[in-house]
Design a protein with these regions (language model features):
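Conserved donor nucleotide-binding strand/loop of the catalytic core
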Residues: 6-10, 20-55
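Acceptor/aglycone-binding surface of glycosyltransferases and processive sugar-polymer synthases
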Residues: 40-55, 60, 72-154
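Hydrophobic residues within well-ordered alpha-helices
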Residues: 82, 163, 167-168
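Acidic donor-binding loop at a coil-to-helix junction in glycosyltransferase catalytic cores
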Residues: 154-163
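Short, acidic, metal-binding catalytic loop of nucleotide-sugar glycosyltransferases
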Residues: 1-5
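A conserved acidic beta->alpha catalytic loop
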Residues: 12-21, 68
């Protein structure tokens, strides 16, 4: 545990592969942990991110995608940067370190690189992986992003772009 008051929220998006049963099995295996399940009302990652963040009670919010392309063991590093005040928004990256073969399809890699170049230019801030699922920010800053979300509305299906643009404002 890297923080005293850790809350884990699983946002389940109506999967048909037994994910919800597995989540409940994990919860039963760790009765001393604060683990909750939220069943997604809408569709897509963006909706899941908003559902999780809106229901989180903590001051520091983290996203870890189920594909685990960023190892959970790296989360304490992200947490420390935010908790120490050295950063306000942390966007993970999968594209600066060697990846396993087939970890990302070529077209996804190419699109992500293209988004990274565009976002770096638009925001005047180096962004190496716009679609990395690992992101960390404070609840206070997330609430500011929500209050100013009108530039994207609910359009962002990934839940990545509105966070990146919102954090840059």
């Amino acid at each position: 545990d890297f923080c005293e008051d850790l809350e884990i929220l699983y946002v389940e998006g109506h999967s048909q592969d037994g994910t919800l049963d597995e989540i409940y099995r994990v919860i039963e295996s760790y009765p001393d942990k604060d683990i909750k399940v939220l069943v997604q009302d809408g569709k897509g990652k963006g909706d899941a991110v908003r559902k999780g963040f809106d229901n989180a009670r903590g001051d520091i919010l983290m996203i870890l995608d189920a594909d685990l392309t960023v190892p959970p063991e790296d989360l304490p590093k992200f947490y420390e940067v935010i908790a120490s005040g050295k950063g306000e928004y942390i966007n993970g990256t999968r594209l600066v370190y060697p990846m396993e073969n087939d970890a990302m399809r070529f077209l996804n890699f190419l699109a992500n690189r293209t988004f990274s170049v565009i976002f770096t230019w638009l925001l005047n801030q180096r962004i190496t992986d716009t679609l990395c699922g690992t992101k960390v920010l404070t609840k206070k800053n997330y609430n500011k992003i929500v209050a100013n979300r009108s530039y994207f509305g609910e359009f962002d299906p990934f839940g990545d772009f509105d966070l990146i643009f919102g954090a840059a404002k």
